[in-house]
Swiss-Prot record:
InterPro entries: MeTrfase_7, MeTrfase_capping, SAM-dependent_MTases_sf
Keyword Transmembrane helix: no
Lineage: Eukaryota, Viridiplantae, Streptophyta, Embryophyta, Tracheophyta
Subunit structure: Homodimer.
Name by which UniProt lists this protein: Probable S-adenosylmethionine-dependent methyltransferase At5g37970
Binding sites annotated in the UniProt record for S-adenosyl-L-homocysteine: Y19, C66, N71, D107, S136, F137
Organism per entry: Arabidopsis thaliana (Mouse-ear cress)
Amino acid sequence: MPTFPQSFPMNGGDGPHSYIHNSSYQKVAIDGVKERTSEAILEKLDLEFLNRNSEENILRIVDFGCSIGPNTFDVVQNIIDTVKQKRLKENKTYIGAPLEFQVCFNDQPNNDFNTLFRTQPFFSRKEYFSVGVPGSFHGRVLPKNSLHIGHTSYTLHWLSNVPQHVCDKKSPALNKSYIQCNNLVDEVTKAYKIQFRKDFGGFLEARAEELVSGGLMILSGQCLPDGIPKALTWQGVVIDMIGDCLMDLAKLGITSKEKIELFSLPTYIPHISEFKANIEQNENFNVETMEEISHPMDYMPLTNDFITSMFRAILNTIIEEHFGEGVVNELFSRLAKRLDKYPIDFKRCKKYVNYFIVLKRK
């Protein structure tokens, strides 16, 4: 059986292949829901709960799966600015000390927190107290009833681990033909679906314990349209191409076919109805907002260099862990050439459904 790392961080540092310099696709998506996030806080957040303890007038914000780079700082700054705007708008007198903000940046233990805090904007250090919170968001990372606003964007497709049967040679769910769940093999899809239900359920249960009554959890990310396999999306096509490039490396003796057959990504894109059903089954939250939206870059043809760099920043660590350091450069060099030879037909590819969801703790 293969051994995968317990965490799958984005590529760290600030070099040319780092997530910092290759996360503009995510940034555009986050910016696209910025106004929705502000509206949700202005309309749904009840600041009265902050005044229940006059000795600790603190609003605690957490960005779950923060990674590194400017995206997380932009998100939390928007939340803080909106809360301040709400207080001014309501024009209420709050008892006790002035409101202070604490921001917890959560990601897996081997996330590059050093780079994260080194690149934090200087002005924000006067706006809020920063804390790094290493740990899997599939479980609790904070004390009970300590969180007021939680946020996560484009993270929930990451699983806590690869489904066990997917990498078991004796299992009918062995994902030997692909390196992802592209919904083309029923047994594989079922194994991933079960793992996702468990992990997403764990995420929601953990947030229910951490959030105060009336606290908000803001989610954004991607799902598949019902009835559409991931293999028909451009993202699915690219990952299948990466699998083909790995097989080319096996033919050259750079890696082995057996290693490839025992490698599968710990990611799963649920169908939109499946995702909604998982949320609605949790009785700890009221669903305040549930919208299906499009990604601002859905109708823009992305360059091959952009695609290669984006996927390298996302997958570098896990591929290096499984196949070794010497494989990564050659793999993504071959991906770039394959994309040049077989360009993605964005008009024919199916598009993800992007979601924006606001949950309120009962």
